[in-house]
């Protein structure tokens, strides 16, 4: 598969909330880096991470408008688009909890799998909503 095909499949699995599909596309030493720089290492840790995130944001999706690939010794893709969803707590949608924001993602592809997935987005509005919104 080309790096574009791998990242396209990864985004498709994210939008389908297909945790098994996501983990099948990750290297065993996969690294996820969030917008605050927090690193989660390992496929199994990210299986738990995506499962938890999809329970908190059950309508999360990425709409990618552009992607670029550079192959300078390793295949790196940059994806640009919009992330959207709504915050749920205890399986209840929080009032006024829908959000949409620009997002960029850097992906490192190795052996037809995602070795690293780094998200660049301003998530402070979502974090603030989580701190202050009550059901």
What are these regions (language model features)?
Residues 2-6, 15-16, 33, 47, ...:
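A beta-strand edge to alpha-helix "cap/lid" segment located at domain peripheries
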Residues 11-12, 24-40:
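Short, solvent-exposed secondary-structure junction/capping segments
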Residues 17-21:
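Short helix-adjacent coil turns
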